[in-house]
Amino acid sequence: LEGNLNHPADYDGVSCFNKFEFDRLLSNSGDFKEVLLKRVLKKGNNYLLPYRKIKNEFGDQFSDELFNDISKNDIYELPFDKNVELIADKWNDFTESALDDNKVYIFECCFIQNSLTIGMIKYGEQKEKIINYVMKVAKIIENLNPMLLYVEQDNLEFSFRKALKERTPEWSTGIVDYYTNQGYGKEHNHSGVEGAIKVLEARRNLELEIFDMLKMKKEKINNTKYEIDSY
């Protein structure tokens, strides 16, 4: 699920540093230097630090200042091309491992949604680059014989406004800001709830374009009536 800190094919709560950045972090980490050295994973020239796991383990001992300093390098805050590199590498590792497993893995949102969120919503990247990102991952996992389930709604605006009413005011404000104050939304001068809906509609259109391009087993699930048990 989204938010799983042990996700086998994605990163959540993990930051990435080069050697210079990591050495600088260590020099400013005080008593936590040894903790960071024990928890860091070096992959090539990248130093990967699962900072949310560290926070969960150490709680208030892990200062907010240090947490915030590390989280600035979260993999989903890095430049688009660096994110693609790291996420594709993670999918490669997962594929190599999963080929030897006799298991079925069910993942939420990490295949298409995350790619479009960082590429389109956050950075407003060219459509071709975003499509290539998804297709790159699709190529990596093709030997796993994946199946894509795409959940859709007939009325996107109704669904979004329903979510805004059901979620906290903080969530509602945050999601509208995220979709309108950066990337695609900012470039197209969208603002407020109406603007966020325009961005969501554009994202859906690109998702459906990618869905049609993918050469894998795939099904659309219409969730307009919110009848999960009927699936």
What kind of region is each of these model predictions?
Residues 68-102:
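Phosphate-binding/switch loop-helix module in NTP-utilizing enzymes
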Residues 98-103, 136-149, 203-220:
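A structural motif corresponding to the C-terminal end of an alpha-helix
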Residues 1-75, 82:
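N-terminal phosphate/diphosphate-binding loop that engages ATP/GTP or pyrophosphate donors
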